């Protein structure tokens, strides 16, 4: 069985209770990317977009690794600095087109099919249509995470998210086995014969389908990845058929995405039915109605970076992946079940009169929308926090410390073991500094997350400090000041009156003119003692 990528025609062109970050962020200004105005899918719900600017109130996906399982990617300025080491899982060297089979190079060498290839059946008897290279993976990746506010091109939905490119589609398709292996590796599962993935993905975007049931091996991969908290976002296919006929969209536990047009209705090509969870902008097969994203100028092999439009459920899925990356950047520990509860309860309704609105279940529960999702996150109940702790504690002293979250005892964790110890509900000061205890709790569908911190100041012991000088000091005479202290810090002796006296590099004091010589000795703070300084005066005479 051969997997088919969704390849439409592309057109060139103290106690601190930290609130949920979703509860306080402001709506950002539009980005300065020159093609942003042409990205209709990023506009507000009023024009059937995802509302990018409201999505960015969550953040822009920083730290949330997004794997794109696709044709690989080409070098593009919109990805600079955020491409992680990926992998090429195409086992068929001929189909891979890069000289070998599986390897650590996930770049896209092009997937064109020529007349000669068809005549010679280079890629098998089922490959019967000529095509230029699709640059499909590059386009999908750009929708998710193209850089924003860099003054060029387009803006991605999660422009700070790291990109994990994983190549599974070559000339005229790919294999289900390669796809399953790629899914497992991308999410951090072990795979014999393949190096361990050092940067597992939190979100896996799969913009490809194969017409078949979800195999036991594929379902097992989805189950294991879901258990690790990996979100698998899949396109539902472009055949205008029941989506339940296509894997991996028919695997239980994937988030399946159908396509809508600028009018907010089901795109004519989009698969449909009960296997569709939600919809997102996928565009119509026209330049003005398509999805504008990153592309490449080459018709066969890659040449220069470019931008182009495409349409398909392949283009819809990455809008959902980008929104989820933004959400999980704000709340990485949010249980995925709560994430989906909030997501499905806050989809934008399909426009009145559309086929999706008239036939419930045809296109999923609604259109994914960042504004509605953000509002739901921000409206969650803030937890009630209480605490009992001293504000200051002397070295060697102990005191009870406790905290509650919504009336239940909070499990406090010590984060500064060199400053204090914590056991049995009591903290003991060890050294000067800030003693910090912390309690965290993930958010849920109804309650904001907790990040409670208790800070106790531990001052150092006040050291004794004296500086012995003679009553008078003759001009040009040199003496060594005598410093006495109980501190284990190293004292520094300096002159406060350099026109009257100076302290040399060897620590000796010398009077250079008549007058009052002021000498300062300073001690730094140490683990046991506080900082201290004193100034002593001596009369310099001739």
Mark where each language-model region is.
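Bacterial N-terminal signal peptides
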Residues: 8-19
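Sec/Tat signal peptide C-region and signal peptidase I cleavage site
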Residues: 20-24
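Structural recognition of the beta-strand scaffold that forms the well-ordered cores
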Residues: 65-69, 85-88, 139-143, 155-156, ...
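Extracellular S/T/G-rich loop segment that most often corresponds to the catalytic His/Ser-adjacent loop
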Residues: 92, 230, 246-329, 333, ...
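Solvent-exposed beta-strand/loop surfaces, strongest in extracytoplasmic domains of secreted
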Residues: 379-542
């Amino acid at each position: 069985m051969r997997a088919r990528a969704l390849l439409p025609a592309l057109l060139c062109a103290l106690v601190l209770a930290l609130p949920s970050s979703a509860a306080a962020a402001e709506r950002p200004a539009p980005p300065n990317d020159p093609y942003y105005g042409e990205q209709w899918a990023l506009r507000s719900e009023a024009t059937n977009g995802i509302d990018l600017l409201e999505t960015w109130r969550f953040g822009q996906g920083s730290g949330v690794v997004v794997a794109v399982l696709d044709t690989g990617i080409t070098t593009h300025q919109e990805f600079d600095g955020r491409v992680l080491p990926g992998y090429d899982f195409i086992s068929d060297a001929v189909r891979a087109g890069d000289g070998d089979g599986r390897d650590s190079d996930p770049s896209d060498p092009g997937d064109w099919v020529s007349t000669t290839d068809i005549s010679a059946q280079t890629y098998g008897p089922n490959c019967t249509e000529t095509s230029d290279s699709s640059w499909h993976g590059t386009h999908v990746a750009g929708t998710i995470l193209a850089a924003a506010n860099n003054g060029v091109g387009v803006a991605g939905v999660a422009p700070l998210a790291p990109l994990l490119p994983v190549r599974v589609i070559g000339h005229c398709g790919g294999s289900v086995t390669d796809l399953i292996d790629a899914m497992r590796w991308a999410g951090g599962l072990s795979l014999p014969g393949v190096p361990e993935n050092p940067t597992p993905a939190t979100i896996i975007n799969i913009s490809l389908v194969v017409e078949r049931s979800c195999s036991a091996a594929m379902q097992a991969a989805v189950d294991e990845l879901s258990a690790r908290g990996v979100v698998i976002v899949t396109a539902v296919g472009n055949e205008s058929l029941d989506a339940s006929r296509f894997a991996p969209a028919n695997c239980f536990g994937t988030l399946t995405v159908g396509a809508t047009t600028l009018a907010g209705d089901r795109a004519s090509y989009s698969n449909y039915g009960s296997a569709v969870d939600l919809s997102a902008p996928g565009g119509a097969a026209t330049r003005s109605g398509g999805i504008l994203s990153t592309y490449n100028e080459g018709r066969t092999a890659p040449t220069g970076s470019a931008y182009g439009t495409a349409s398909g459920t392949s283009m819809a899925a990455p809008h959902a992946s980008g929104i989820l990356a933004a959400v999980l950047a704000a709340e990485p520990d949010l249980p995925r079940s709560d994430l989906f509860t909030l997501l499905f309860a806050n989809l934008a309704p399909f426009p009145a009169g559309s086929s999706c609105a008239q036939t419930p279940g045809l296109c999923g529960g609604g259109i994914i929308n960042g504004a509605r999702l953000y509002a739901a996150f921000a409206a969650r109940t803030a937890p009630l926090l209480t605490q009992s702790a001293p504000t200051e504690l002397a070295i060697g002293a102990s005191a009870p410390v406790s905290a509650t979250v919504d009336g239940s005892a909070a499990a406090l964790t010590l984060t500064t073991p060199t400053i204090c110890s914590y056991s049995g509900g009591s903290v003991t000061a060890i050294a000067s500094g800030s003693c910090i205890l912390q309690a965290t709790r993930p958010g849920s569908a109804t309650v904001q997350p907790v990040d409670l911190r208790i800070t106790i100041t531990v001052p150092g012991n006040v050291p004794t400090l004296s500086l012995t000088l003679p009553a008078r000091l003759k001009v040009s005479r040199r003496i060594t000041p005598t410093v006495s202290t109980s501190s284990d810090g190293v004292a520094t002796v300096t002159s406060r009156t350099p026109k009257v006296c100076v302290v040399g590099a060897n620590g000796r004091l010398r009077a250079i003119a008549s007058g009052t010589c002021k000498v300062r000795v300073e001690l730094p703070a140490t683990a046991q003692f506080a900082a201290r300084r004193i100034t002593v005066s001596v009369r310099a005479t001739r």
